[in-house]
Curated annotation (Swiss-Prot):
Activated by MTM1. The gene is MSD1. Residues 1-29 form a transit peptide. The modification Phosphoserine is found at S124. Binds 1 Mn(2+) ion per subunit. It is found in: Mitochondrion matrix. Destroys superoxide anion radicals which are normally produced within the cells and which are toxic to biological systems. Its cofactor is Mn(2+). Keywords: Manganese, Metal-binding, Mitochondrion, Oxidoreductase, Phosphoprotein, Transit peptide. GO terms for molecular function: copper ion binding; metal ion binding; superoxide dismutase activity. Homotetramer. GO terms for biological process: embryo development ending in seed dormancy; response to zinc ion. It holds the Pfam family Sod_Fe_C. This is Superoxide dismutase [Mn] 1, mitochondrial.
Length: 231
């Protein structure tokens, strides 16, 4: 199984590069599926390897492909002066571009327990969480409750409001990035609550997924972003 996974990832990488090269020749900015810094099965038992592989290779790849296609169509429409098509493409760009942005953050927000996943945040982020939410447990409880309450599909976020210099918890619908809730918001931790993120393992019990995902949250990465942006 592991050999097949590696082979499929290499094949996928080759297809991504070929597609990107063709679009670059035409002078169009393109985006590619980022590699994961861990194996698909590395987050088990919190998130199954099957979910991670499908989520990454199928769902995220689809957002990247559709985003690039929409940008290519936008380029053509702008060159033709086709204003109606330019306007029509905005929803596809927002949805698929947002899907690419959000998932690129999500993969970094996760880490195997052997590499620090689930370890509590330290330093200034840990102190800020205690100040704003009382404790890490208080933050986890709040984010899990708000994530479980999302109607349909979306995301739950821990963000930094750079203008107000404070941490915030918010949700976004569908694939809207956190920045759509405010230009000064920087995502620190984003948790995908679309069914494709958990259904194969947790069925329709989203709260159980939200309970276990914290066991593989990469607080080290969140702390690095916080340190960089909170200045």
């Amino acid at each position: 199984m592991a050999i097949r996974c590696v082979a499929s990832r290499k094949t996928l990488a080759g297809l991504k590069e070929t597609s990107s090269r063709l679009l670059r020749i035409r002078g169009i900015q393109t985006f590619t599926l980022p590699d994961l810094p861990y194996d698909y099965g590395a987050l088990e038992p919190a998130i199954s390897g099957e979910i991670m592989q499908i989520h990454h290779q199928k769902h995220h790849q689809a957002y990247v492909t559709n985003y690039n296609n929409a940008l290519e169509q936008l380029d053509q429409a702008v060159n033709k002066g086709d204003a109606s098509t330019v306007v029509k493409l905005q929803s596809a760009i927002k949805f698929n571009g947002g899907g690419h942005v959000n998932h690129s953050i999500f993969w970094k927000n996760l880490a195997p327990s052997s590499e620090g996943g689930g370890e509590p945040p330290k330093g200034s982020l840990g102190s800020a969480i205690d100040a704003h939410f009382g404790s890490l447990e208080g933050l986890v409880k709040k984010m899990s409750a708000e994530g479980a309450a999302v109607q349909g599909s979306g995301w739950v976020w821990l963000g930094l409001d750079k203008e107000l210099k404070k941490l915030v918890v918010d949700t976004t619908a569908n694939q809207d990035p956190l920045v759509t809730k405010g230009g000064s918001l920087v995502p620190l931790v984003g948790i995908d609550v679309w069914e494709h993120a958990y259904y194969l393992q947790y069925k329709n019990v989203r709260p159980e997924y939200l309970k276990n995902v914290w066991k593989v949250i990469n607080w080290k990465y969140a702390s690095e972003v916080y340190e960089k942006e909170n200045n």
